[in-house]
Amino acid sequence: MQQNEKASLNTSAAAAKAGSYTGYADVYDFWYYHQRGDGLTVNGKPSYTTDKAVSEGLTRPHTTWNGDNVFGKAANLTYSFLNTFSSTPNGHTGPVKFTPVQMQQAKLSLQSWADAANLTFTEVSPNQKANITFANYTRNADGSLNTDTQAYAAYPGTHPVSGSAWFNYNQSSIRNPDTDEYGRHSFTHEIGHALGLSHPAEYNAGEGDISYKNSAAYAEDSRQFSIMSYWEVENTGGDFKGHYSAGPLMDDIAAIQKLYGANMTTRTGDTVYGFNSNTDRDFYTATNSSKALVFSVWDAGGTDTFDFSGYSNNQRINLNEGSFSDVGGLKGNVSIAHGVTIENAIGGSGNDILIGNGADNILQGGAGDDVLYGSTGADTLTGGAGRDIFVYGSGQDSTVSAYDWITDFQTGIDKIDLSAFRNEGQLSFVQDQFTGKGQEVMLQWDAANSTTNLWLHEAGHSSVDFLVRIVGQTAQSDIIV
C-alpha cells in the first residue's frame, strides 16, 4: 500500500467502525499490527525501525571479514570442524568433534545466511586455517562437567580465535539439532556472531541480571524480530508456542545485508513458501498441518506465493514488506524482509484475513469466512467456500485502468465492503447513470458474460475512476456502504 492510501486507512477507520461490522475494521487493525518506529513507545521502551535496530543494535561491532567499518562488500569464507583443541577462549575443555548430524545442520545454517547476503562458504579440512570453526566442548577449566552454558562465538578479525564457534555437547539441543529446533537456532545465532553481528543490545549470558525488561534497549529486541536476540517472542506480542526460527529473521536479514550486501540471486524464479514449497529450505516448507513455520522471507524476484492452505486455524496473512503474519495457529511467526515482494497468498480452511500489496496480487481465501483486501494493483480475489468479505480502502485500490476481479462472488452470502469511503460522505446507489454529485455506486450487470461491474464515483472527482469486475450477479444488498 502506498503512503497516501495508508493515510486513507487512518482517516477512514473511525467511519468504518462507526457502522455495523465491516471487514474493513479487521483490515485496519491488521495493517497496523507490529507498527514500529515513528516515535512509538512499546513496553516502556522506544520502538526502533529495522534500519535503527540494525545500525544501533545488530551491527554495533562495526566489523566484517573485510575489515572494520567495511560494509556492503561480498566475502568468500572458509569453515572447518575441528577435531580437537586444548581449551576455548572461555577456558572450556573436553573436546568432542562435531557429529555428522551437527555438521549437516551447521551447513544449513550457513546456507541461510548466504541466501540473504553476498557470502560464500567453502569447507576446508580441520588442519587448515578457516575463517569460521566449529567445535563442541563438555567441561569447565577445572575439569568438572559443564551443564550451564549453551554456545558462544567470536567476531571476525585476525586473532587466532576470530570466527570460532563453540557449543556445549552436554546440551540435548546441541547434540540433536535436527530434532530440537533450539539447536539449529543456536547454530544460526552463533554463526551470526562469527559474521559480525551482535546481540541487539549490550548483554551476554551469565553477565548480571539480564532480562528483556532490564537489558533490551528497544521494544523489538525479541526472537520475533531477530535470531540474535535472547528474549522470548511474547515480549513483543508474538506466540510461537515454543518453536524457534532456523534462519535469520527480518532485522537479521537487513543487518547481514548491510555488512556484506544483499544476495540478489536468491530465489529469482516463481517461489512457493509453505505448502507445496519449491524453496529447498526446510524452514520455508510445510509438509503437513502440524508443521510450525517460523521464518522471514528473503526473495530476490519472480512471482511468489505464500501457500498456507493446509492449516485449519484462523490466519492473518499480510503480503507487504516489513509485515508479520499469523500462520498455522502461531502469532507473528511469518514476516517479509524489507525489499521483498510476495505477490500471491493462499489461505486455509479457517476464517482468514488476507492483505495484498502494490503488486497485481492473487489472493485465495479457501474455505471459511474470509476477509480479502487486495490493496492497490490489478488483483484477482477468490473467496472460496464460506461467507467472504472483499474490502476496499480507497479509490486507488481498483481503478478503471487497473481493476480487480472477484472470481467467485456468491450473492446473498458474500459482501463487498466500501465502508472506508464513508469519510468522504455517505454512499448511495444509482441505477443507470451518475448524477455528478459524487459518492454514488452503480452496479452494471453484463448478462452475456455473467459478470457485474461495480462503479463508484467519489466525491470531488471529475470522472468515475473506481471499478471492480465481479464474476456473477451482485445485488445492492451485497454491498456494505
Swiss-Prot record:
Ca(2+) 2 binds at residues 302, 304, 341, 343. InterPro entries: Hemolysin-typ_Ca-bd_CS, Hemolysn_Ca-bd, MetalloPept_cat_dom_sf, Pept_M10_metallopeptidase, Pept_M10B, Peptidase_M10B_C, Peptidase_Metallo, Serralysin-like. Ca(2+) 4 binds at residues 357, 359, 361, 374, 379. Ca(2+) 7 binds at residues 384, 386, 388, 414. Its cofactor is Ca(2+); Zn(2+). GO terms for molecular function: calcium ion binding; metalloendopeptidase activity; zinc ion binding. PROSITE patterns: HEMOLYSIN_CALCIUM (PS00330), ZINC_PROTEASE (PS00142). Keywords: Calcium, Hydrolase, Metal-binding, Metalloprotease, Protease, Repeat, Secreted, Zinc, Zymogen. Ca(2+) 1 binds at residues 267, 269, 271, 299, 301, 304. Gene3D superfamilies: Collagenase (Catalytic Domain), Serralysin-like metalloprotease, C-terminal. Pfam families: HemolysinCabind, Peptidase_M10, Peptidase_M10_C. The active site is at residue 190. CDD domains: ZnMc_serralysin_like. Ca(2+) 5 binds at residues 366, 368, 370, 383, 385, 388. One of its GO terms (cellular component) is extracellular space. It is found in: Secreted. It catalyses: Preferential cleavage of bonds with hydrophobic residues in P1'. Ca(2+) 3 binds at residues 348, 350, 352, 365, 367, 370. The keyword Protease applies. Binds 7 Ca(2+) ions per subunit. Binds 1 zinc ion per subunit. The Gly-rich repeats may be important in the extracellular secretion of this metalloprotease. Belongs to the peptidase M10B family. This is Serralysin B.
